[in-house]
């Protein structure tokens, strides 16, 4: 089930994007064009002879492309999509005991959980697999459409389809969505925050990602530049605390506390940690 709360693109500038496609995929490209247009994105269709690595290198600007695997974001010779199917090996290894995120979010209790910083949806995919009922909130129309496409593909996968009904995609601004829950006096068990730009450690040094800031994240940073508007984080914490019994914030291990607020509890891993705030 997908939900449009009407505020997904309210604060975003007008967007225009190319979709590159081979002629065999024209119908799919036209479908994505119509969907994106309904979400405020003007899309120019660009049929090409061959969508391959050479073409992507020669056309480095941020764009979309369509092939037999659906919709992709491309730039600088790379392309990416949330690709939930690629997460299957990780999911099959995961248990409530082995996953720190499961302990932090109490997934064994099958919570209703709002993921207010959707990203590529991989953490939500894991949490849904382990039993949570997920409300996955994303306001950027292109990223939301990529997530929607990944979920649609997952619904046809024998393994992933078993728990896709536990993931609800919501096209909305996370702050507005949390405010709406508060105004309607609705609560959830958990709000999960994984800000894309944690930036600084305790010594105010910029945090370096792993040598390969994943290809996916490189392209996401191009789509969602750190311009203040897209840097989801500090302002969501207080909103989340109003509607959830438990707020869990994922941070790089040495990052400063979100909004400089010390958590009530922490779970520490080698590369990241989970900070907990309780109501």
Swiss-Prot record:
Its EC number is 2.1.1.242. Coiled coil: none annotated. S-adenosyl-L-methionine binds at residues 138-139, 194. Pfam families: SAM_MT (PF04445). It is an enzyme of class 2 (transferase). One of its GO terms (molecular function) is rRNA (guanine-N2-)-methyltransferase activity. The keyword Methyltransferase applies. One of its GO terms (cellular component) is cytoplasm. It is found in: Cytoplasm. It catalyses: guanosine(1516) in 16S rRNA + S-adenosyl-L-methionine = N(2)-methylguanosine(1516) in 16S rRNA + S-adenosyl-L-homocysteine + H(+). The keyword RNA-binding does not apply. Keywords: Cytoplasm, Methyltransferase, rRNA processing, S-adenosyl-L-methionine, Transferase. Belongs to the methyltransferase superfamily. RsmJ family. Specifically methylates the guanosine in position 1516 of 16S rRNA. This is Ribosomal RNA small subunit methyltransferase J. It comes from Acinetobacter baumannii (strain ATCC 17978 / DSM 105126 / CIP 53.77 / LMG 1025 / NCDC KC755 / 5377). The gene is rsmJ.
């Amino acid at each position: 089930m997908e939900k449009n709360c009407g505020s997904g693109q309210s604060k975003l500038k007008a967007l225009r994007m190319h979709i590159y496609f081979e002629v065999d995929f024209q119908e799919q490209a036209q479908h994505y064009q119509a969907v994106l247009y309904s979400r405020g994105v003007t899309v120019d269709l660009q049929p090409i002879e061959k969508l391959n690595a050479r073409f992507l290198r020669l056309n480095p600007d941020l764009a979309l492309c369509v092939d037999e695997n659906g919709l992709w974001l491309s730039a600088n010779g790379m392309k990416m999509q949330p690709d939930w199917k690629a997460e299957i090996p990780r999911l099959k290894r995961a248990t409530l005991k082995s996953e720190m995120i499961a302990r932090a979010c109490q997934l064994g209790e099958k919570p209703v959980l709002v993921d207010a910083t959707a990203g590529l949806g991989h953490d939500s995919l894991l949490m849904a697999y382990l039993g949570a009922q997920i409300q996955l909130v994303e306001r950027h129309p292109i990223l939301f459409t990529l997530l929607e496409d990944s979920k649609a593909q997952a619904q046809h996968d024998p393994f992933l389809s078993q728990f896709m009904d536990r993931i609800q995609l919501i096209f909305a601004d996370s702050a507005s969505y949390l405010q709406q829950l508060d105004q309607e006096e609705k609560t959830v068990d958990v709000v999960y925050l994984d800000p894309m730009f944690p930036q600084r450690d305790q010594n105010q040094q910029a945090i370096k990602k792993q040598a390969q800031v994943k290809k996916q994240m490189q392209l996401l940073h191009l789509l969602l530049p750190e311009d203040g508007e897209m840097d989801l984080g500090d302002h969501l914490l207080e909103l989340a605390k109003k509607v959830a019994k438990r707020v869990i914030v994922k941070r790089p291990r040495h990052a400063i506390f979100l909004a400089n607020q010390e958590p009530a509890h922490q779970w520490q891993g080698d590369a990241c940690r989970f900070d907990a705030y309780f109501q």
